[in-house]
Amino acid sequence: MKEIDELTIKEYGVDSRILMERAGISVVLAMEEELGNLSDYRFLVLCGGGNNGGDGFVVARNLLGVVKDVLVVFLGKKKTPDCEYNYGLYKKFGGKVVEQFEPSILNEFDVVVDAIFGTGLRGEITGEYAEIINLVNKSGKVVVSVDVPSGIDSNTGKVLRTAVKADLTVTFGVPKIGHILFPGRDLTGKLKVANIGHPVHLINSINRYVITREMVRSLLPERPRDSHKGTYGKVLIIAGSRLYSGAPVLSGMGSLKVGTGLVKLAVPFPQNLIATSRFPELISVPIDTEKGFFSLQNLQECLELSKDVDVVAIGPGLGNNEHVREFVNEFLKTLEKPAVIDADAINVLDTSVLKERKSPAVLTPHPGEMARLVKKTVGDVKYNYELAEEFAKENDCVLVLKSATTIVTDGEKTLFNITGNTGLSKGGSGDVLTGMIAGFIAQGLSPLEASTVSVYLHGFAAELFEQDERGLTASELLRLIPEAIRRLKE
């Protein structure tokens, strides 16, 4: 976003002060939208010396004469030119400024506007700044942050020792990554994105996006009235073992619930009977295995089954042993269809196989699986969108790095999903997602599109659960997917 600001100013000739004025006014309008008539409130505006502080002075000036009271506490040591300019304007308009923060001052105001640090902050917050932020967080006042809560790294969402906990954050142009990755997402509060006049094509040139309702609605496959099951694709799911009999069913039903025409399950016998007995919609093919796990002896049979489908999902409930490892890697190396690779298939995957494949692949790891795949710690990979992009690009695949904010990337374009709740933190929900992605690929979406639509709907369905989210199960999630699609189309 910094580069877009600079291009807007230098290449398009938009005065930086105009951008700052629009930013400040947009904050006032957003507060009015959230709080109602601002005349009932008293505002304390905390300004640093950077351009974020300059935005704060614009906010304060535009509140003069509108609200009960407004006071700026200047917390900087020196000011950028645009901050200096708006400080001067605020003073000329009769605005009050103090340069010493007294804890008792918080008692005199209803709303605190945080314009201390913006997106340029990199070092940790210590000393007086940390003390002030902690006092603001404990004050119980309504807190509005300008652009990003002070103390959040706008590129990662990490807390730089301490950070403001906002009720409302007003940002400019596009959401920042720090707003959508945790813990920054928890501290942002309600996020409003204001258009302050950047050229549209510069905004559109950004290759990292938040997945939106409108985006997903536009990608949903059409359902022509004159159609048949072949119109909506065929999926093969290779899954299950003597240890895990439910995973194949959850994946299979995930595919059917998003509209797939036909779903076959290849499951070790007798575990396949569970699908046959409970879900007659699923075609369950019994696979004779050695000790209940897939091995190379099942390779040709599974390749044969893959010939008359559009996409293969592999991994849920396979188990993790040397026989499974050999089977998965040889199967994927030989398979000439798109593949969705999940769970145990990721745990045993040799990534060199991905480079050898000529057909598309989607990988859907959670952070633990991703850490094992790239031989790093969970902390190194969780929310690490740059690592995800690098992996996807190097291995010519789509990566769906699952977490509370899920990252979807093909290495060129990256999307962040923010739907969902803690009810998805439960065994089986990932199996459902695997089936959904395979189902949308079968219906004609690209692997990136299918992954984008699926993660959004998966989370949206969880949000529709009528009871406390902790009681959500994968089976309940399946029930809610069609309702999520119906509401999306409204």
UniProtKB/Swiss-Prot annotation:
Please list the residues that bind K(+): 52, 114, 150
Q: Which residues does (6S)-NADPHX 1 bind? A: 129, 147
NAD(P)H-hydrate epimerase: region residues: 1-204
GO MF annotation list: ADP-dependent NAD(P)H-hydrate dehydratase activity; ATP binding; metal ion binding; NAD(P)HX epimerase activity
User: Biological process (GO) annotations?
Assistant: metabolite repair; nicotinamide nucleotide metabolic process
Q: Per the database record, which ranges form the YjeF N-terminal domain? A: 1-204
Query: Where (6S)-NADPHX 2 is bound, by residue?
Result: 317, 431
Matching SUPFAM superfamilies: Ribokinase-like, YjeF N-terminal domain-like
Q: Give its E.C. classification number.
A: 4.2.1.136, 5.1.99.6
Top-rank taxon: Bacteria
Q: What's the catalysed reaction?
A: (6S)-NADHX + ADP = AMP + phosphate + NADH + H(+); (6S)-NADPHX + ADP = AMP + phosphate + NADPH + H(+); (6R)-NADHX = (6S)-NADHX; (6R)-NADPHX = (6S)-NADPHX
Q: Extract the ranges annotated as region (NADPHX 2).
A: 366-372
In this chain, the stretch annotated as NADPHX 1 covers: 51-55, 118-124
Record carries keyword Ion transport: no
Q: Do you know which PANTHER family this protein is assigned to?
A: ATP-DEPENDENT (S)-NAD(P)H-HYDRATE DEHYDRATASE, ATP-DEPENDENT (S)-NAD(P)H-HYDRATE DEHYDRATASE FAMILY MEMBER
Q: Record's NCBIfam families? A: yjeF_cterm (TIGR00196), yjeF_nterm (TIGR00197)
The name of this protein is: Bifunctional NAD(P)H-hydrate repair enzyme Nnr
Q: What organism is listed for this UniProt entry?
A: Thermotoga maritima (strain ATCC 43589 / DSM 3109 / JCM 10099 / NBRC 100826 / MSB8)
Q: Which gene encodes it?
A: nnr
